[in-house]
From Swiss-Prot:
SMART domains on file: Ribosomal_L14
MF annotations from Gene Ontology: large ribosomal subunit rRNA binding; structural constituent of ribosome
Family indicated by similarity: Belongs to the universal ribosomal protein uL14 family.
CDD domains xref list: Ribosomal_uL14 (cd00337)
Subunit structure of this chain's protein: Part of the 50S ribosomal subunit. Forms a cluster with proteins L3 and L24e, part of which may contact the 16S rRNA in 2 intersubunit bridges.
Record-linked NCBIfam families: PRK08571.1 (NF006344), uL14_arch (TIGR03673)
Entry keyword rRNA-binding: yes
InterPro entries listed in its UniProt record: Ribosomal_uL14 (IPR000218), Ribosomal_uL14_arc (IPR019971), Ribosomal_uL14_CS (IPR019972), Ribosomal_uL14_sf (IPR036853)
One Pfam family it belongs to: Ribosomal_L14
Species of the source: Caldivirga maquilingensis (strain ATCC 700844 / DSM 13496 / JCM 10307 / IC-167)
Record keyword Cell membrane present: no
Protein name per Swiss-Prot or TrEMBL: Large ribosomal subunit protein uL14
GO biological process, one term: translation
Entry function: Binds to 23S rRNA. Forms part of two intersubunit bridges in the 70S ribosome.
């Protein structure tokens, strides 16, 4: 029997499935110099959970999330922003069979169009995030 419905994510180009490592209400570090230090994940861009009751959306490297700034400069605190996940602690498997895990969970603050707000990224950036978001790759110092 053929599968009904469209692709898994509507409007987002297909990508290799990664193990989710960051969920709602997770506190994550900010890896750029935008002024925020710690943010809380409050939403996932492109996730619609009305079909599955009580499902908590999870994100992995390269996904865009909605965050609330918890720690940082006074003018940045309590703002609702968008961010891209560039590192996750949970191990995920790449198509070549290697497993990758980072020391912390980290995001990069971006605008709604995907333009990076900072001018540099501290620490490594996952290759999956760099391939999906070229603006992040252009300011990254290390891509793993």
């Amino acid at each position: 029997m053929a599968k009904r419905g469209g692709p898994r994510t509507v409007g987002v180009p297909w990508r290799f499935h990664l193990t989710p490592g960051i969920f709602m209400n997770s506190l994550v570090n900010v890896a750029d110099n935008s002024g925020a230090k710690v943010v809380k994940v409050i939403g996932v861009v492109g996730h619609y959970s009305k079909n599955v009751h009580r499902r908590i959306p999870g994100v992995s490297v390269g996904d865009m999330v909605v965050v609330s700034v918890q720690e940082g400069k006074p003018e940045m605190r309590k703002q609702i922003l968008r961010a891209i996940v560039v590192r996750q602690r949970r191990p995920f498997r790449r198509p070549d069979g290697t497993w990758v895990a980072f020391e912390d969970n980290a995001v990069v603050i971006v605008t709604e169009e995907g333009q990076v707000k900072g001018t540099e990224v501290h620490g490594p950036v996952a290759m999956e995030a760099a391939q999906r978001w070229p603006q992040v790759a252009s300011i990254a110092t290390m891509i793993i």
